[in-house]
Amino acid sequence: MNVRTKNLLALGLASLTIFYAGAALAQNNKGQIGTDQFWADFSKGLEWLPTSKSVSASPTVSNLEIATDSLNSSLSPLVDQAFDPDVHRIVILSHKRSIIHRKYNERWVNEKSRPSSASMAKSLTALAVGKAICNGAIANVDESASVYSSRLRGTSWGNAKIRHLLAMSSGSNKPVYSPTGSPTPQVQAETLAKSYQGKMTHEFVSLMVKADEKYAPSGQQGLYNNLDTQALAFLVEDATRQKFIEFFEREIWHAMGASQGGSWSHNSLGQVAAFSGFTAHPYDWIRLGHYVLEERAKDTCFGQFLKEATTRQSQVVLPNGSAAYGFQTWLGCGGVDTFCFLGHGGQRLQMSPSTGLVMYVHATSLSASQSLLAMYRSVASRYPK
């Protein structure tokens, strides 16, 4: 097992714990943190929350084929062996825009399920930053965020280079690992502790100001920090002069050809929770994965941004070491030449540029991911690089 894999597994063992109704309760010995009721709600998505705001399906849906035998393909023995019904709920494998295998834990989900994604939303936020750069709203990632966002001025996030916000290295707080990505107890109490109930009421900028320790100049140390992502959303809004969700809908969701709409959690003041809470159908996550791979391969502004986004920009501190991190994107991800979007409990969109293999996972335990990663490597080995 390589160092990156070990570090990501360490991340899983610690888990990105989200507290629901004031408690985090282990429900089994497979690493699930949170009640079965929490995960039942999570599997249904968060669009029912009164503070969720929707994005529409794309006017032009991109191609995604579904093999006729995808529920019982030649990969069934391999996937079934890796799939743990105690913690795994959906696994979808797709090769170059063709879904080759699907598996659903029918106790909890079905083909119509639209689970939430937790911190996978962070990676979506980075994609929006890339589009803002390529549209000319932002000149480059080596400028300070305060050049574009007056509300971030005087904070660590405003002083930080945009590159460093993307790499989770704002320097705002002491680099001490937080399993939730909340740098202070107040941030935890006012965001994740309330987000899954639709009860976030605190204005995010004032919360950031209170949490800002101005620990170090940006770029010195990676720290998984939800507020770095939130700063990026404000940056996009202020640079483009549009609501983040409107810009994201047009530049990412419609551009990649989503077949269904999605929704994103907001606070009661209408500020997007950029760090968590995007809900969509798994097929559209798969479409997004292929879109990222295809755009990354192009010699365009966005292609260059994606290449940077998927190369090491920082080392994010973990309980037992650190992990390579790009622009709001995890690197390594269990082998091959992969990078991935990760969320609490094992939500995952995994992509391999050399093979074109994309995997979507909805689960309740990140620490139980090892079998799925081994399966992914085995499937990837069937495709020439």
What residue ranges belong to the model's regions?
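N-terminal leader/targeting segments and the immediately adjacent pre-domain N-terminus
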Residues: 4-13, 19-110, 134-138, 167, ...
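Structured C-terminal helix/loop/strand segments within mature extracytoplasmic catalytic/sensor domains
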Residues: 22-34, 340-385
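Active-site SXXK
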Residues: 97, 115-141, 165, 232-236, ...
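Short, charged, amphipathic alpha-helices and their helix-cap/turn boundaries
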Residues: 98-103, 146, 181-218, 242-261
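Extended ligand-binding groove/face enriched in aromatic
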Residues: 116, 152-208
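Active-site helix/loop module of the DD-peptidase/beta-lactamase fold
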Residues: 135-177, 214, 238-280
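Active-site-proximal alpha-helical segments within enzyme catalytic domains
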Residues: 228-235, 274-298, 347-363
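Active-site Gly/Thr loop motif
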Residues: 259-262, 307-358
